[in-house]
């Protein structure tokens, strides 16, 4: 929107403004006693040319400069837990480092669904109705809610394990929709290998996850395949709400030698409860990301969600600055993974950490 004053980019406004100035000059000459016929020496076209330089300076003084549009970015996050919080922070920080600051040249509307799918839909509808220029969806359920409501607004996702199996894109290599972003696919096979290293005598693994989270189902499939290779048996322990986490975890006591938790949003938000039950019963818990280790789980080999958020912001900049389309932007992954071990937990449950993992 232009600032207050004349929009000198409009030819019509230019003509009216020039004519008024010319008329004023003629009146001034008349008032000074000079005959108006003298003005014939300066044809209208010549006078207009002489005025262009003056008008250029006047434009600055009267505020005719066009202001840049504020870019509206809507963000919906499924739930609060360290991994998703870090992804959000990385996204915002990377935009700021690139000169796109909330309240200055971009407007960020951040909403948290508090783990409720119904809230995801309500928030997604709000962001679409507000005509956001770009929407960031953090976690698979949030991404699905937004993608179901708009096929026009560019959508970037992060902390989504497999956008293709979540039906957000036609393929991860060539999305072909208004959705792209970054995957938080962790090395599930390597995590099961880590479990076997830390618990060499393990025979049975409890698979603790929410069966309605597509990202978790995908990871559990990979983890089970690796268990099969290593000769490990497994028991599914699924939850449908955070209220069930403690009871379901307790049901594994005496049945399993270790517990595996993927990057499951529902279980992650209740990982303190899981760790408390597991640690009291000296059951090692291998998880999908470092935030869960910090809150009591034993270990992980996973990605940095802050870096994942920053990588998503770089994709957003490509859309904002370079006009790229999500349809043509492949899903991106982090290549580097990090080992994290909670030594206090290890000591509490009697696990010795091999020297090469210290």
Residue ranges and their predicted role:
Residues 21-22, 44-45, 49, 64-358:
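Short hydrophobic alpha-helices and adjacent helix-cap/hinge residues
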Residues 1-8, 12-71:
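Short, low-complexity disordered leader/linker segments with a strong preference
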């Amino acid at each position: 929107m232009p600032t207050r004053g004349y929009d000198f980019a409009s030819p019509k406004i230019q003509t009216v403004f020039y004519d008024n100035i010319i008329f004023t000059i003629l009146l001034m000459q008349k008032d000074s006693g000079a005959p108006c016929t003298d003005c014939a020496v300066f044809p209208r076209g010549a006078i207009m040319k002489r005025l262009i330089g003056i008008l250029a300076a006047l434009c600055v003084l009267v505020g005719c400069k066009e202001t840049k549009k504020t870019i509206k970015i809507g963000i919906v996050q499924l739930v609060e837990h360290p991994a998703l919080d870090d992804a959000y922070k990385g996204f915002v920080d990377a935009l700021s480092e690139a000169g796109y600051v909330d309240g200055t040249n971009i407007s960020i509307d951040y909403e948290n669904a508090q783990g409720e799918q119904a809230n995801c839909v309500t928030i997604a509808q709000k962001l679409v109705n507000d005509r956001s220029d770009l929407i960031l969806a953090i976690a698979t359920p949030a991404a699905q809610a937004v993608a179901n409501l708009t096929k026009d607004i560019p959508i970037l996702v992060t902390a989504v394990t497999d956008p293709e199996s979540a039906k957000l894109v036609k393929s991860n290599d060539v999305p072909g929709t208004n959705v792209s972003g970054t995957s938080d696919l962790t090395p599930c096979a390597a995590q099961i290998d880590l479990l076997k290293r830390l618990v060499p005598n393990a025979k049975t693994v409890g698979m603790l996850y929410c069966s309605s989270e597509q990202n978790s189902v995908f990871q559990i499939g990979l983890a089970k395949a690796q268990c099969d290779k290593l000769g490990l048996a497994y028991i599914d322990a699924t939850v449908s709400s955070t209220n069930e986490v403690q009871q379901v975890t307790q049901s594994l006591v005496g049945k399993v030698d270790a517990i595996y938790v993927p990057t499951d949003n529902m279980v992650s938000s209740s990982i303190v409860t899981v760790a408390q039950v597991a640690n009291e019963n000296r059951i090692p818990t291998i998880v999908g990301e470092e935030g869960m280790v910090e809150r009591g789980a034993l270990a992980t080999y996973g990605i940095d969600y802050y870096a994942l958020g920053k990588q998503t912001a770089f994709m957003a900049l490509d859309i904002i600055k370079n006009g790229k389309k999500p349809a043509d932007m492949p899903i991106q992954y982090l290549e580097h993974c990090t080992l994290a071990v909670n030594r206090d937990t290890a000591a509490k449950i009697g696990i010795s950490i091999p020297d090469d993992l210290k």
